Amino acid sequence: MATIEHRAILEAPPERVFALLERVEDFVDYSDLIERIEPLGEGRYRWHVHAVRMDWTFEVEITERRAPEALAWESRSGVRNRGRYRLTPVPEGTEVALTLEYEIQSRLVEKAVKRAVTPLVNRVSQQILDRVAARL
């Protein structure tokens, strides 16, 4: 699996940041690439994303919810991925660290995705955190 990491500082305590990140359905408002998120119950969600000129659908399950320190998920269908937000208090507020791992099954698609995905994920991650920060 390929791994992407992104870090940012938000000027708010971890409790406030975590409260926004754990509202998974609201990620639709945090990124232009997320078309919709369907709650499936029991910590599971179906994501519909348009990225790299393709539509992607995958189901994820929240695998760890430890307020206000960590929120993690893993895909259960569709694009294989897992990720985690780690929140750490710092003098300026909260350091938010995203680690995202993914695997694309098609070699042709994987090559195109690898070229575009790292800057794309970093941009989307920053967009998400900027929009979360605006709600704090």
Regions found by a protein language model. Give the residues of each.
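Hydrophobic pocket/interface hotspot
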Residues: V17-L21, F27, Y45, I62, ...
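Glycine-rich portal/gate segments that line the openings of hydrophobic small-molecule binding cavities
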Residues: E38-V79, Q127-R135
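Short, surface-exposed coil-to-beta transition loops
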Residues: T3-E5, D55-E59, R80-R84, E95
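Hydrophobic ligand-binding cavity/cleft-lining segments
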Residues: M1-E42
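Generic structural detector for well-ordered beta-strands
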Residues: R7-E11, E38, H48, E61, ...
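A short, structured loop/turn motif at beta-sheet edges
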Residues: P14, E42, T63-P68, R86-E95
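Beta-strand/loop substructures that line and gate deep hydrophobic ligand-binding cavities in soluble
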Residues: S75-Q126
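Short, intrinsically disordered, mixed-charge
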Residues: A19-D29, T118, N122, Q126, ...
